[in-house]
UniProtKB/Swiss-Prot annotation:
Pathway(s) this gene product operates in, as recorded in its UniProt entry: Protein modification; protein ubiquitination
The family this protein is said to belong to: Belongs to the E3 ubiquitin-protein ligase UBR1-like family.
Domain comment as written in the entry: The RING-H2 zinc finger is an atypical RING finger with a His ligand in place of the fourth Cys of the classical motif.
GO biological process: negative regulation of SREBP signaling pathway; positive regulation of flocculation; proteasome-mediated ubiquitin-dependent protein catabolic process; protein ubiquitination; ubiquitin-dependent protein catabolic process via the N-end rule pathway
A matching Pfam family: zf-UBR
Keyword terms, alphabetized: Metal-binding, Transferase, Ubl conjugation pathway, Zinc, Zinc-finger
Superkingdom of origin organism: Eukaryota
Name of the protein in its database record: E3 ubiquitin-protein ligase ubr1
């Protein structure tokens, strides 16, 4: 910029200021008011240039050379700093200061911390020792906060952090620090000064209240007032006629609401632009939606956006541009604040801090008007300026001038007249200053609401990261916060759109520091400011003065103040301040604070009174009571905090404080005429006619009464502290205490009336309030204090004078003075009984709970509370905490006391929780009449105690009176209440009322029990002391009332006489034992009185009563005889029962033989001994009709066919997995103790043993490093190594076929009738739920087959003929070459065609006929003889086979018509449904999931895949019983065994139906059967069996047949067993040997092609003592296979194939042998399952083998299959054998056709594991710190980890969604395809997905007390339960149960679906 002549004389700093100011003013115009990356780049260049005084040679003070500054340039990064420096050795300092981001986890330690504000980041927490400490963690809501590691003021002792406590000298040596040139210092100060002023100039005109829509005039006015001043910025600020509409973020509207409203307002065709803007708004906090010159058009759009209350502003583009510039400038300040200059780290931040405490020099065009408008919004002057000397303050600050409004702080006369002096600042404070003393810092705080989300967060980072660490600046910040607090709180409470980002949360980080808090309270009267803020907020009174309140103001419970929950934070601020010891000391010594809180509490005194609805119900009930109750709870909590402050106050001062509160209660201040509640004004004492003083008359059943009396609650705290003093004196009269007690007494009586249902017409809201008032969250702050005040009054007053007032408030005068038959004006008879019982219960509670009076310490109170919680049953820790009072729970001794009182039992089962059981000795604390117990709990507690003492004293339960042994009164301080004449009179009238009143005695049982309990209470407590109460029972006489005269002949009687009469009364049998105990005690305590009064009782009682009393002894003897007779009868019945059982055992065989005879008739079984069937007839009934399942009606079992990707392929190229195969245990049919196994276990050990804070490279800026590090942390199985297929599973329930059809119709109708529900099933996929277990199903397998016996393999005998003989007899002679034999058959096809047709038809027809039950078949007549198989059949075979051969009908007309088989239509219909289900599941992902093959092809693959998955799911996880099964198959569940056999028979039947000649066609056809059979036989034998030779099969060329070595050998065997080799059922043992050999050859082929992997894993193999001579045959086999790889297959030779030298290495051969053994074990396990379910082989009857042997050896022995060595030696000895011919055929076939096929892949033989999780969930938090999603490159707010592959994903986040599909669903399609399992880390949940639905479950983590924590609401550290991980998540995945689990969850919780309901 060129300088004119006038500027040459200006100083350098002025020139810098002028140039920079002019640039900042003109910057927007330079870019036509359009913000861009270029504008940001030019701005950064300018401010860096200004920083250096436009002298670029000074760049060497910052960097070695001048950098190129672009829009992303950061000086801090250029200097080598990076994210995570606070953790990196060499760069971190002694303090961490890590700022918590939103969603980040931080920790608290109650044991170590000073208060609850102390926090540690996850890395520092992990690097410090907190063993056995009480810790918790919280997920940050983004409201600020930083790590306190290294902050000594935050911790009780030294918290040694391994990161920040290192001994390295992190300071820079003096040689590295250069002096900063003076001109550079000046330029830095000038630049920062100019930048700060510009930012404030711009934001001073920004809108603050966005709730009000702008108008045309206000927009134009805003444009004018926002112009910058020419005097300050050097040029005239031109107007701007372009305007932008800005949409702001809030926390009320969803992402969808935003983008849909944008689309609607702008009338866009789709949501693309709306979603883009919504993402920007969500990330940044605001976005410019549209720009226009037409303001009216913008207003029109804005009105549409505001229809759903979205926040909208419209400003000129110039101002929007400048606001964006200010955001960059603030980021720039944060950048340089963390940078160094000339080696000085904190120089920049120091300069910024100095400039922030200087006044703001306003630079607006109309500065006076604009500034006044700005101040009008502030409207609150500060209390006092900073006048203490500080490094940041100098004379320029004190003397500087700025805009001011000197009149704004003046007190108005009418206001000051209504203030009390205790709201004024103390005299020691300086005078209130004007606005001239405001500094820039104040405005940055006050303009917080004008900023958007990201900028607010950036400013808080600046405060916390750099300013708070400056020496002395924390106190300055605290002072400025104190000055602005009132306005900040008002903005937060009323206007803030994003309250979690408010600067008020940051402020709490400052003023809760002890030193700062003391300074603010003493110097700035900050506590008064907070108190006044809360006072004026609830009174809805806005004043221009800071700390003065209107004491005549009143609350309005219907105002917005009560509906907002934000006031809770202000309450917390006060509570935090009061919890600081130095602040508490100030408060208790200055009475003005007590008066302030008394004024505040007085606002709520008597709030929301109720008057009883007498004649009619309340018609309308609003919900305002909930808001009132929430406010009342916070007020009550504040009462506790305020009261606790005065705990240590001097006794005399405490008495003065109590006097003040009592006077305030007794003489309340006059209320406004609008105040309707007169209850608080109606208190006092009156004197009756006889001169007795009592409470004034007040009928709570007719007059108003309120729950809320916080002044009383506060008074109780002070009184309880006062009476604990040793030198206290009662300075208050009894009458004063009684008058003060009136309000709590009314509440107690009111609650009793509500329990008696007197207030039922007032509706449910009052009932709910009463419930909450006595509920746990409330009663410790309210109801308990009411009772305590009554207790103090009764204890320190005269009970005989006070109890009558209690009776009066309960309105029981008539009953307590003997007027029983006088009708009550309010109560009916039942209500009188309840009120009397409630009154007694209240008195008992007052007497028994003496914790305060006896000065119990906190430990004893905790023990007392826990005993009353755990006495009923063991409870988990979370339930205990829910039922424990908050002040006990928050105490540091709670957990240690809990462990002392109770015994902890760890969680055992997968659904169990750890629990605490109360130790026996602590049952002595239990009081069944605890006032918080319900009637049921009281009775249960009594029974528990009776059983306890019955056991201890060996007494009958009926005769135990627990009061005789159980200590309830732990103190004698309240006994005088029980010994008073008034209490004796209460008991007398209560018992007499129950005795004589003509009413249902059953309803009086509770009243009588309570009265007698009170008697026993005092009698037991008098033992060993003067028996005052005992004497009064016998001596005190009461007039005989009406009704008692028929029992007594005296004008007055004692209580003793009444009890004697009741003892043997038939209506009071239930209390006879208690009365007997009372008599016993009286006889022993007062024997001199007992005999006379007993004789008197006999003399005054009526004749009837006398007779009953004299006969008492005889009656007791009679009862004893009856009891003995009953015991004798019970013994006789038990003996008879034993004899009966013995008889049944001896004669059971007769019944069994009868049943067998019946079954023999039905099934033509000749033997009398039952034979085990292949499928036992089901004993269940039909799920729908509940009829028995018999052959009269077809039935079947429900099945679910689903897509699956469970099976894993073997990554042979990865040496880690090859090594894992070698580590597989020898036996997989036992539980593997090492969990997880293999690589997963090794990864888990690494995760658990490695401390992540040791990594210096924990933070990265390059994506590749992040992904690599994360992959190392959570590595799963490669997703490209999965084999996808179809899996069938069943729930085990049966249904009739016709019932099934009806059920499907019903489900369809019900689903379509409710289209808006997120249904658990998908009709388009033919899904439905099992009616019983709610498992997901989609078809039914009909049970069609005749009963057949299992094959006992041992008894049937093994086919011992050589394999060669069987092959020759079954196929052909191997004397000729294979190809030549095939050629011979092809040259003479006519010889075989006709015989084949007849043979095949006969075989299939007879097999099908023999297998089906009669009800499914019928013999057909001649009308069906023309059924033919269509010539044009399946499309798959039209082009491949039938083009060459004309296929004629296979039906021989010569076959008699009555021998042909016709099958029921239902069967074909059900199998067609199976076709449809398989097609739907196969074609859903047809491109990359399952190829669309023929119908039969997919069905047989379903069978083989299901068997493989079942076998894989049981590896190493079958828990053997005490008697191990002969084979692992028999360890499966019975239902699964049955289902597998049904599956096998169903697939076999499907194959037979494909070849059946009928028009009722299913999907498969005989042509497809021929093709599949041809391929299977050609692969295994090299040619066809004679029965399959036909023109069709002869036309199939070899290139259409895949080689055997390409396919999985077992799956080929399983598929052939139900299709191509159906005719070889009797030869399954030979087939097993054949496929077993092929499997060995195939696996050798695969392993030999992976040389590198073999050589790597060979290094880790421990070579045991082994005779290598035994490997000669194996070596020969390996060499032959290896040669096959090299012959005639140049294109097939793998570059990684083993060399000839490798094969000479015995170690390599041994490694190959061990690998083959592992593969052979898996193959034989699968074959055993196939034998069981397909061929019906049972191993159960075989003698148990030695289970010390390996499972492989046991399987080989059972199945008579040779081992690898035996087979190799056999092949070596017979080099020209048939087996070798087949092996050569398999190899040659592959080498010839291999280029057309994929390379063979083996299935993974290891134990299937999910991603390993560390033992501590804290470790997961640590490992995910600063990790970024690979898609959006941001740190996920809700990270999810795929438990298949371990990838980090964004959960429920729009950033990574596509077309409405979230990243978890998108990833699932690329990973497991069919289902998804994800760990949602910060919710401690498992997410299961089965598109399009999903559901949560609890993650397998438990806390230290054995409990799960879904959502991490309790915040306790979680630890992995590997057992739960295996038995829930892993087992559900392997069993294919996840879709059913999701369906059950959705069925139980009907909703509309989507993220909001997931």
């Amino acid at each position: 910029m060129l300088q004119d002549e006038s500027s040459r004389s200006l100083p350098r700093s002025a020139l810098i200021r002028r140039r920079l100011s002019l640039f900042l003013q003109s910057h927007a115009l330079m870019y036509s008011f359009l913000w861009s990356e270029s504008a940001k780049k030019s701005l950064l260049n300018e401010v860096f240039s200004a920083l250096l005084g436009y002298d670029h040679t000074l760049w060497n003070t910052l960097l070695p050379e001048r950098p190129t500054i672009d829009a992303s340039f950061l000086l801090r990064r250029a200097q080598g700093h990076s994210e995570g420096d606070e953790y990196r050795h060499g760069t971190c300092e002694s303090k961490c200061g890590h700022i918590f981001r939103k969603g980040e986890v931080f920790y608290r330690c109650k044991t170590c911390s000073v208060d609850s504000n102390s926090a540690l980041c996850v890395k520092c927490f992990r690097a410090t020792s907190h063993k056995d400490h009480e810790t918790s963690f919280t997920v940050s809501a983004g409201s600020g906060g930083c790590c306190d590691c290294g902050n000594a003021a935050a911790w009780i002792g030294d918290v040694s952090c391994k990161i920040h406590s290192h001994e390295e000298d992190a300071t820079i040596s003096n040689d590295m620090i250069d002096e900063i040139p003076e001109k550079l210092e000046n330029s830095i100060q000038t630049t920062i000064d100019c930048v700060l002023d510009f930012v404030l100039d711009v934001f001073s005109c920004s809108p603050e209240n966005l709730k009000k829509m702008p108008t045309l005039e206000s927009i134009l006015q805003d444009e004018k007032t926002s112009r910058l001043s020419e005097n300050k910025y050097g040029d005239i600020d031109d107007s701007c006629n372009m305007y932008s509409l800005v949409l702001w973020n809030d926390e009320k509207h969803s992402f969808k609401q935003f983008y849909e409203q944008i689309t609607t307002a702008l009338e866009l065709p789709n949501n693309v632009f709306g979603k883009k803007m919504a993402n920007i708004i969500n990330d940044i906090g605001r976005a410019c939606i549209v720009t226009e010159t037409n303001i009216k058009e913008l207003l029109k759009i804005g009105q549409k956006l505001a229809q759903i209350n979205l926040a909208v502003s419209i400003r000129s583009m110039r101002d929007i541009f400048r606001e964006e510039s200010c955001a960059v400038l603030l980021e720039w300040l944060a950048d340089i604040a963390g940078s160094s200059i000339c080696g000085k780290r904190n120089y920049f931040s120091s300069v910024i801090c100095k400039e922030l405490v200087r006044p703001w020099n306003c630079g607006l065009h109309n500065s006076d008007l604009t500034f006044r408008l700005s101040l009008r919004s502030l409207a609150l002057p500060e209390i006092v300026a900073i006048d203490s000397p500080d490094i940041f303050l100098n004379e320029d600050h004190i003397n500087s001038s700025g805009p001011s409004d000197t009149s704004s702080h003046m007190l108005e006369t009418d206001e000051s007249s209504i203030h009390s002096r205790h709201w004024y600042p103390s005299n020691s404070l300086p005078d209130v200053l004007s606005y001239a003393s405001r500094v820039r810092f104040d405005y940055f705080f006050l303009y917080d609401l004008k900023l958007w989300k990201s900028l607010r967060y950036k400013l808080q980072e600046l405060y916390l990261g750099y300013f708070i660490t400056q020496p002395g600046f924390k106190e300055i910040m605290g002072a400025r916060i104190a000055i602005s607090y009132r306005r900040l709180a008002e903005l937060f409470l009323l206007l803030d759109r994003e309250p979690e980002h408010s600067v008020i949360f940051f402020s709490m980080q400052i003023f809760t520091v002890a030193d700062v808090a003391k300074l603010l309270v003493t110097e700035y009267d900050f506590l008064t400011t907070i108190n006044a803020t809360l006072y004026t907020f609830f009174t809805y009174k806005k004043l221009n003065t800071p700390n003065y309140v209107d004491q005549h103001a009143m609350i309005r419970t219907d105002s917005a103040a009560f509906h907002s929950r934000r006031y809770i934070h202000i309450f917390h601020h006060i509570q935090f301040m009061l919890s600081i010891p130095c602040v508490a000391e100030i408060v208790r010594e200055d009475l003005k604070f007590l008066k302030q809180y008394a004024d505040f509490f007085n606002l709520f005194q008597g709030m929301c009174p109720y008057t009883r609805a007498v004649s009619q119900h309340v018609e309308w009930e609003n919900d305002s009571w909930m808001y009132v109750l929430n406010v009342s709870l916070q007020v009550a909590k504040l009462c506790r905090h305020v009261g606790n402050v005065f705990m240590e106050l001097n006794t005399n001062k405490l008495a003065n404080a109590i006097n003040y509160l009592i006077s305030l209660i007794l003489y309340p201040k006059a209320r406004n005429e609008s105040w309707t509640n007169t209850e608080s004004l109606t208190t006092g004492i009156t004197v009756d006619e006889r001169g007795n003083s009592k409470l004034i008359e007040y009928d709570i059943a007719l007059q108003p009464v309120s729950f809320h009396h916080p002044l009383h609650w506060l008074l109780v705290y002070l009184l309880s502290f006062y009476v604990e003093r040793d030198n206290y004196k009662l300075l208050w009269t009894q009458l004063d205490l009684l008058a003060v007690t009136d309000h709590p007494l009314r509440v107690c009586a009111w609650l009793s009336q509500m329990r008696a249902k007197l207030w039922i017409r007032n509706g449910t809201t009052l009932r709910d309030q009463a419930h909450h008032y006595r509920n746990l969250s409330f009663h410790e702050y309210t109801f308990d204090l009411d009772v305590l005040l009554l207790q103090l009054t009764l204890t320190y007053g005269d009970p005989d004078a006070i109890l009558p007032s209690f009776i009066s408030r309960f309105q029981l005068e008539d009953q307590m003075y003997g007027r029983f038959f006088v009708p009550h004006k309010h109560y009916d008879v039942s209500q009188v009984t309840i009120m009397m019982e409630e009154f007694l219960l209240l008195l008992i509670s007052i007497v028994c709970n003496t914790a305060v009076l006896d000065h119990w310490d906190i430990t004893r109170r905790i023990e007392y509370g826990i005993a009353h919680i755990l006495c009923f049953r063991p409870l988990p820790y979370s339930e205990i905490t829910k039922r424990t009072c908050e002040h006990l729970l928050e105490h540091k001794q709670f957990e240690s006391t809990l462990k002392k009182v109770a015994t902890f039992r760890n969680a055992e089962g997968i659904n169990d929780s750890g629990s605490f059981t109360l130790k026996d000795e602590y049952f002595d604390y239990v009081d069944p009449f605890n006032i918080h117990y319900s009637r049921n709990q009281r009775e249960e507690a009594e029974n528990i105690l009776r059983r306890r003492y019955s056991k201890q004293h060996s007494k009958h339960l009926e005769s135990v009176v627990y009061e005789e042994y159980h200590p309830i009164l732990h103190s004698n301080i309240t006994i005088p209440i029980l010994q008073s004449d008034s209490f004796v009179g209460i008991l007398w009238h209560t018992i007499v009322y129950a005795y004589i009143y003509p009413y249902d005695q059953g309803k009086l049982e509770g009243l009588v029990n309570t009265a007698l309990h009170a008697c026993l209470l005092v009698l037991m407590s008098e033992k060993g002391s003067e028996p005052i109460f005992s004497k009064k029972i016998c001596e005190n006489r009461f007039p005989v009332v009406e009704g008692l005269q028929e029992y007594c002949n005296s004008p007055d009687v004692t209580l003793f006489s009444v009890l004697c009469q009741m003892k043997n009364h038939r209506n009071f049998v239930y209390v006879k034992e208690k009365i007997s105990l009372i008599m016993k005690i009286l006889k022993s305590e007062v024997p001199l009185l007992y005999e006379p009064v007993y004789a008197e009782t006999l003399s005054i009682s009526s004749s009837k009563i006398v007779q009953s009393l004299s006969d008492a002894e005889q009656q007791e003897q009679h009862l004893a005889k009856v009891r003995m007779a009953k015991e004798r009868q019970a013994r006789i019945m038990e003996q008879f029962r034993m004899q009966q059982n013995k008889f049944l055992e001896n004669h059971a065989l007769f019944e069994a033989s009868d049943c067998e005879m019946d079954e023999a008739d039905e099934f033509s079984v000749t033997s009398s001994v039952s034979t085990k069937l292949f499928l036992d007839p089901p004993i269940d009934t039909c799920l729908l009709c509940q009829e028995e399942l018999k052959d009269k009606r077809p039935y079947g079992t429900l099945v679910f066919v689903l897509r699956s990707s469970v099976l894993r392929l073997f990554p042979a190229d990865d040496a880690n997995y090859v090594s894992e195969v070698l580590d597989i245990p020898d036996s997989l049919d036992h539980e593997i103790q090492e969990r997880p196994f293999g690589l997963a276990g090794k990864r888990k050990k690494v995760l658990d043993s490695t401390e992540a804070y040791d990594y210096d490279n924990y933070y990265y800026e390059k994506k590749g490093n992040e992904l690599h590090q994360l992959k190392d942390s959570f590595n799963g199985f490669p997703p490209d190594q999965l084999d996808r297929g179809l899996h069938a599973t069943g729930c085990g329930h049966f249904m009739h076929i016709d019932c099934f059809k009806n059920h499907i119709a019903t489900v369809t109708l019900a689903t379509r009738a409710n289209p808006y529900r997120n249904h658990p099933h998908n009709l388009s996929m033919k899904e439905f739920l099992c009616p019983l277990c709610k498992a997901l199903c989609n078809t039914i397998f009909p049970i069609l087959w005749r009963p057949k016996e299992e094959i006992n393999f041992q008894e049937a005998g093994v086919l011992t003929a050589p394999l060669k003989n069987w092959l020759v007899s079954k196929t052909f002679s191997f004397n000729k070459d294979l190809n030549q034999q095939l050629l011979d058959i092809e040259t003479s096809p006519s010889e075989h065609t006709q015989s084949y047709n007849l043979n095949l038809l006969d075989v299939l027809q007879h097999t099908l006929r023999d297998s089906l039950k009669d009800i499914y078949t019928l013999n057909t007549g001649a009308d069906n003889s023309s059924d033919n198989v269509e010539e044009n059949a399946d499309n798959l075979f039209q082009s491949s086979v039938l083009d060459h051969v004309h296929f004629k009908s296979v039906v021989n007309n010569e076959v008699p018509a009555d021998e042909r088989l016709a099958i029921s239509d239902d069967i074909f219909e059900l199998y067609r449904r199976l076709d449809d289900v398989i097609d739907l599941n196969s074609s859903l992902y047809s491109d990359d999931f399952i190829p669309v093959n023929g119908k039969l092809h997919n069905v047989v693959k379903l069978f083989s895949y299901s068997l493989c998955q079942v076998e894989a799911s049981t590896r190493g996880h079958i828990k053997c019983s005490s008697i191990p099964a002969d084979i692992w198959v028999h360890n499966l569940g019975k239902n699964q065994q049955v289902f597998l056999r049904i599956l096998s028979e169903s697939i076999k039947t499907y194959t037979l139906l494909c070849a059946h000649d009928s028009q009722k066609r299913i999907g498969g056809s005989i042509q497809e059967f021929e093709f599949i059979s041809f391929c299977q036989q050609k692969r295994i034998f090299g040619r066809l069996l004679p029965s399959l030779d036909s023109p069709v099969t002869k036309s199939i060329t070899d290139d259409r047949v895949e080689p055997l070595l390409v396919k999985d050998t077992f799956r080929e065997f399983a598929e052939a067993s139900v299709s191509g080799l159906l005719s070889c059922d009797e030869s399954f043992h030979y087939l097993t040997q054949l496929y077993y050999t092929a499997d060995i050859v195939r696996n050798l082929w695969i392993l030999l092609s992976q040389r590198n992997s073999l050589l790597k894993c060979m290094e880790s193999v421990e070579f045991e003592a082994f005779d290598y001579e035994q490997l000669k045959g194996f070596e020969h086999l390996v060499i032959q296979i290896w040669k096959s790889l090299r012959v005639d297959g140049a294109g097939l030779i793998n570059f990684d194939c083993c060399t000839e030298d490798d094969l000479n290495n015995p170690h390599l051969l041994f490694t190959l042998y061990k690998l083959l053994e592992r593969f052979s074990l898996i193959f034989l396990r699968k074959c055993a399952l196939l034998w069981y379910c397909r061929y019906g082989v049972s191993f159960e009857t075989q003698p148990n083998l030695n289970f010390q042997n390996s499972e492989l050896s046991r399987l080989q022995t059972k199945m008579h299959i040779p081992g690898v060595i035996e087979l190799s030696n056999h092949l070596c000895l017979t080099a020209s054998s048939t087996e070798w011919s087949l092996i050569k055929h398999w190899c040659n076939f592959f080498t010839e056709t291999g280029p057309l096929c994929d390379f063979p892949r083996a299935y993974y033989p290891g134990i299937y594991e999910l991603v390993s999780l560390p033992y501590e969930l804290d470790k997961v938090f640590e490992l995910l710190l600063a990790r970024r999603c690979s898609k959006c490159l941001t740190e996920p707010m809700e990270p999810a980890i795929c438990l298949f592959c371990g990838k980090l994903l964004c959960f429920q986040s729009h950033c990574c969604s596509f077309n409405g599909i979230g990243e978890c669903n998108l990833h699932m399609q690329q990973c497991a395809s069919d289902i998804g399992i994800f760990l949602i880390v910060k919710k401690c949940a498992i997410l299961y997905l089965n598109p399009p639905v999903g559901s949560f479950s609890v993650a397998p983590f438990l806390d230290a007390y054995g409990e799960t924590d879904l959502g991490l609401r309790r915040g306790r550290s979680q630890y992995l339960s590997q057992k739960r991980y295996d038995e829930t998540v892993r087992t559900m995945w392997l069993n294919g149960s996840i879709p059913s689990y999701i369906a059950r969850q959705l069925d139980a919780n009907p909703d509309t679906g989507g993220w909001e309901t997931l």
